[in-house]
Amino acid sequence: MNILIINAGSSSLKYQLMDPETGVVSAKGLCERIGIDGRLNHKVGENKVVKDIPMPTHSEAIAATLEILVDPVNGVIKSVDEIDAVGHRVLHGGMEFFDSCIINDEVIKAIKKCIPLGPLHNPANLMGIEACQKVMPTTPQVAVFDTAFHMTMPPKAYRYAIPTEYYENDSIRRYGFHGTSHKYVARRTAELVGKKEFKMVNCHLGNGSSMSAVKDGKCMDTTMGLTPLAGVPMGTRSGDIDAAVVQFICNKYGMSVDECLNMLNKKSGMLAISGVSSDFRDLEDGAKNGNADCALARDKFCYEVAKYVGAYAAALNGIDVLTFTAGVGENDTAVRAAVCEYLGFMGVKIDPELNSKRGKEMMISTPDSKVQVWVVPTNEELMIAQDTAELVNAAK
C-alpha cells in the first residue's frame, strides 16, 4: 500500500511516499517558495534532485510532486493510481475532531471553523488538502490532527480556571500539540513493554517540547495548552509564565500584545536565557567552555522537564514507563541523565553506558529501576500513514 503524506505550510509542502505496514519511505521531498518562484527538492534513497518549477499555488506544488513521483528516471511509481490514499497533517482540530478522519465537505468546514485556534497553520493545511482534491479527485484523503491524541484528557486537565463563557463561546481550553508523535510513541512503547495497560510519561523534547501523561494508551494530560507556547521552556518559546508578565512588558516597553507574544514565541526560551542559541548542542558546547548562561539554560530545561514528570507521576498515581523522544530526547544524553537524576526519589535509575548511545530505540534503565526508561525515536509520518491506511481500509 502506498500512502502519500502531506505537510503543507504557507509557502512550502513536505511530502513522503510510504508503505504503512513496513514504514519504508520510497521517496520524500519538499516544495518550497510556493507563491514566489518555486523549487522542488526530491530524494529517493541517497539520490537527490533539485528543480526550479513555477508554483504559484499549492495545486502546482502537488502537481509537481506527483509528476516527479511517476518520472521514469527519478520516480518510484508508474502511475498516480498507485497512490492508495493521502494523509494530511493538520495542526488544530479544536473541539471538532477527536481522531483522524476521512476528508469530506463537512470535515473541511469544521477545519475552517478551527482557523481562529490555528491561524498560522490551519489555512495552509487546508490549501494542501484542497490542492490534492483538485489534482487527485478520486483518491481518498485523510486528516490527521496534531491535537486529536490529547482529546481524551478529562475536564480537570483541560479546563482553564477562567470564566465559563470563554470555554463555552470560544473553546478556550488546553488542547496540546505534538499529538501524532505522542500517539506513535505510546503505541510503540506498548509493543516494546509487551502490554497495553500501563502508565507512562512521554517527553517529546526538541526545539519545541511537550510532555504527556498517558494511561493505557490514552492521554490524561499534556504540557502545551491552547497554543504551543505553554509548558516547559523550549528553544525560543518561554513555556509557562505568569500571564500578567504580558501586561507588565506591554505597559513598560510600549509593546502591543502581538509584539509581546512574538517575543515569547520567537525570542525567549533557551535563546533568551543563554543569550547564545536555541540549539541545545550549542548550549552544551558553551557550558563546557565555561559559559554560565548556557549552563543555566540547560539546567532550567532539565529542571522543568523533571518537575512535570513528577507532577504527572502524581496525577497518574505512579508511572511504569518514562520515554524520551524527538531531537533532544533521542540524542542529548546529558539532558536525559540530568532529568533522570532528579527522579531518583521515584526509583528511576539509568545505566550510564546505555544512556551514552544516541538516536537508538532502547531501554536505558537498570534492571532494578522502579520505572522503565526508554528512548523511542518518533516517527510522525509513519503514524499518519498508519492512521490513513486504517481509515481507508475500514471504509472499503
Give the label of every model feature segment:
Residues 262, 269-273, 280-315:
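Adenine-nucleotide phosphate-binding core of ATP-dependent small-molecule kinases
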Residues 149-252:
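Glycine-rich phosphate-binding loop of actin/hexokinase-like ATP-binding domains
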